[in-house]
């Protein structure tokens, strides 16, 4: 069933119809389209287009259709309707006859689809927020269980300073908290209803759009009809949030892929999230993490694609906007799947503490401590930095860690070095001294875990 046709004397070419139709992807808006139609039927009563009895009949039929869709959503794709709006209206007419043809009075598919998509976005943001917080909780739990797992921290993929696995987990909690905040901010801006804006100039019926927005669960109604039907900022914002969120998950995956290598050996992944090789029987591949990392690109592509689609569009609605859905659906589905998978990876991870500690003791990760020790003895930091660099070169030459160089050797680089230097060079001392807010000291990590637990509830 087409919602237009009187203007045309020829039928659409089937090739054009296939090119133009959107039901194959906008079927996902079925529930939102039906909910929006129920609200619109109520609004039509207030302006005398429908009687209360007619509205009740329409609402009952729409609610039955809603249950049918929830029970068997695949039925929608069996239709040759142009889009989800055509499908819903056609099914409604099948149920109530001519009365169904009155529902679209004063409404355009332009404000209808804008409303449907915003309702879908609100529902999906709620799912994303739940999944995000579940992953944050999984990271906090992993941090709680690994506060004593000392490991090397890296810059430039070179061992830099000792940290703990707990501190590493909490770094990703911070990233995910920002992702959560971005979603909440986006939700505030998309929580305005475009329904009642018509094709572009507004509806000719004196409908209370604020009341209509409230029936649909929106905070308010939009203020300008031209903007309302052409606005896709919420699509861009959610795609941007997804793109940033997927970058965080990709970095998380890359870290764990490295930690899981034979060369690092800091963690072992569960059999539940790894796979084997068809040729090499010894292999245990981190496929879940590699797929998270790999899927990041498609989400970035969806954001870029939508930016390019919108950049040259004049006001108001253009068919180009039909391209807003496939990329958005795929990007948010992908992000949601990856959030769930990241939590599953953490659920079975094993941290190999002895190997982590062994690696932390290598690479002269305590060199900064020696520099700070010299500063405490009155040596200017830049001079101390140079002195320690020379000491590291000598330690490398001898094949020893700094703490195994004899005092006489260390004093060749600076006479202020005394026996009290050796406790300073221990891993525990390296951690304990990082006691400022946000640092890796046990006290700060414990406080960060407690703060995250309280915030997540």
Curated annotation (Swiss-Prot):
InterPro entries tied to this protein: Arg_succ_lyase_C (IPR029419), Argininosuccinate_lyase (IPR009049), Fumarase/histidase_N (IPR024083), Fumarate_lyase_CS (IPR020557), Fumarate_lyase_fam (IPR000362), Fumarate_lyase_N (IPR022761), L-Aspartase-like (IPR008948)
Subcellular localization(s) per the UniProt record: Cytoplasm
Pathway membership: Amino-acid biosynthesis; L-arginine biosynthesis; L-arginine from L-ornithine and carbamoyl phosphate: step 3/3
One GO term (biological process): L-arginine biosynthetic process
A single GO molecular function term of this UniProt record: argininosuccinate lyase activity
Principal location: cytoplasm
Gene Ontology CC entries for this record: cytosol
Statement: the UniProt record of this protein carries the keyword Lipoprotein: no
Transmembrane intervals: none
Catalyses which reaction(s): 2-(N(omega)-L-arginino)succinate = fumarate + L-arginine
Entry keyword set: Amino-acid biosynthesis, Arginine biosynthesis, Cytoplasm, Lyase
EC number: 4.3.2.1
Family: Belongs to the lyase 1 family. Argininosuccinate lyase subfamily.
Xref: PANTHER family: ARGININOSUCCINATE LYASE
Protein name stated in the entry: Argininosuccinate lyase
Taxonomic source organism: Escherichia coli O157:H7 (strain EC4115 / EHEC)
